[in-house]
Amino acid sequence: MYCKWYLNLHLVCVVCKVYTTATMEGVMIKNFVFRTTILLGVISTAFAANLNTARIDELTGLKGKMNEKEGVYKVTFPRNDVKVVVGGWTMPPFMGLGTWAAFTPTKDGAMVMGDTVLFEDEVNAAMSAALDNGLNVTALHNHFIFDHPKVYFMHIEGEGAVDKLAGAVRKVYDATKQVRAASPNPKDSFGAARLSEKSSITAAPLNEIFGAQGESKDGMVKFTFGRPATMHGVKIDKEMGVNTWAAFAGSDDNAVVDGDFAVTEDELQPVLRSLLKDKINIVAIHQHMTYEQPRIMFFHYWGRGQAKDLANAIKGGFLVGGLLKVTSPLP
């Protein structure tokens, strides 16, 4: 498969060597930059030749476009099925409502990266489809404010065989289409039973599940677990914002849990899978800091159900990610 690539690389190296010996010392830096550009171009083109773009089109159901310079094949489509208004202005998809996935060849197959435009009721279906089919979800956030309906953007990444990656991308797109087919207009709620305005959560069972004493206030219960890290050489932990927390409100039989997980990059995907499996909605994935060690990702969640079931779902995320081993004790 790579014979052509190695041959091209060898020829370029020979040419570069001859070209170098024929130049004066004063222009060696310019020649080096020139030769490097040629070399990278040949490598990129040779790798791109091994990318089965026809198969990507077939599996994604889209017609892509190749960037020969970067060796990247990109498929895209506009989210023009739902009218989006930002600040009172109807926004054309060209202005930032385009879903895309870009493929670049690697020695083991390909890498895909992409951004998926989603409405609120599509988020968890699309995220589950991505994770269930071997893709990583690396961010979930908004690009606008005062947009209606609310628009979210889910970033994905994966490596492996082209067929597997393109097929996984198609699964994500199909998941959003299924949601819109069932309800052409995005929903404005989770559809769960109405919560009581006055909360009455029993703390004891939740304390037992988490193995910690929660903070109680007005019938609500909140648990906060820190994890040690450093930023700019300074130790930071729970009180400085490096924490996972879960807050419960409502009643024992009709409760809501919301909170935030602080996880490393290696922990992110398995914890997301665990919570989605237990019907916990993921509502944001992002960073809170820069230059921290280890790098910490934060994701926010929202769940409805019986309080104990919700607590067990959150604890399940702790167990899958190994977070119980790193959390700092509560006072």
Spans of model-derived segments:
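Bacterial N-terminal signal peptides that target proteins for export
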Residues: V27-T37
